[in-house]
Regions:
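Active-site glycine/GP-rich loop and adjacent strand/helix microenvironment
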Residues: 1-224
Length: 224
């Protein structure tokens, strides 16, 4: 929510919904609203979230409430069966309108394929980004057949946390390149991590082939 709130307006207008969605207290209502706002658009080209389990959860909520969601898209509403604060519903009004043609298209997809996969309801999806390392593969394997990988590039989201984004992946590997121009980094050799007197190194002191732990100071002064 903070990311969507703070991005430049020229980018923000391309999002399917406002940051206020992330302030919906009820988890199920929040996920329903996220997918309801996104599914009304055929031309979604990018889908990004940190944990791939979120992809599965959003698809589950969509499928379990599909007819209700299609009715919402058709009529331009958001179901009253979900607990969404009045002020957030009011803000969402500018993002929704009746789209009977889109609802009909989605029903036709369901009738012809027997399922609702992203490769069918978002045919122009070009980019998917989540974490891809560690045990995230457990979740990834459950939706890999739902995307058209000839059209959609799947990239590691990169080195990111609540406090800041540390780096970005430049290819289809799980490696991240640090953003040295955005934060201040210090490094400690792996062998010194448990030492009470750590030797902190600057980025120009690192040696190729060695392993380090990164300590980050953000623009706001947060040290981690």
């Amino acid at each position: 929510g903070v990311l969507v709130r703070d991005i430049p307006s020229i980018i923000k207008k391309h999002y399917t919904g406002p940051a206020a969605v992330m302030s919906i207290p009820d988890y199920g209502a929040r996920n329903y609203t996220l997918m309801r706002l996104a599914l009304q658009h055929r031309d979604v080209t990018l889908w990004a979230t940190a944990n791939p389990s979120t992809i599965l959860e959003l698809l589950r909520v969509m499928n379990e409430n599909l007819e209700e969601m299609l009715h919402d898209i058709e009529t331009g509403g958001i179901s009253e069966n979900f607990d969404i604060p009045f002020e957030i519903r009011a803000e969402l009004d500018q993002y929704i309108s009746p789209k009977p043609e889109r609802a009909a298209e989605l029903r036709k997809i369901l009738e012809e394929t027997g399922h609702m996969y992203p490769k069918d309801f978002w045919p122009w999806l070009q980019y998917l980004s989540t974490w891809k390392c560690g045990n995230t593969k457990i979740y990834m394997d459950k939706y890999m057949d739902q995307f058209d990988w000839d059209k959609t590039f799947y990239q590691e989201l990169g080195y990111i946390a609540t406090e800041c984004r540390f780096g970005f992946s430049l290819d289809d590997t799980n490696e991240s390149v640090l953003f040295p121009q955005f934060h201040y980094y210090e490094f400690v050799e792996e062998s010194e991590l448990d030492s009470p007197r750590k030797h902190f190194l600057q980025i120009d002191e690192l040696e190729l082939g060695k392993r380090y732990c990164a300590y980050v100071t953000t623009y706001s002064g947060l040290f981690r």
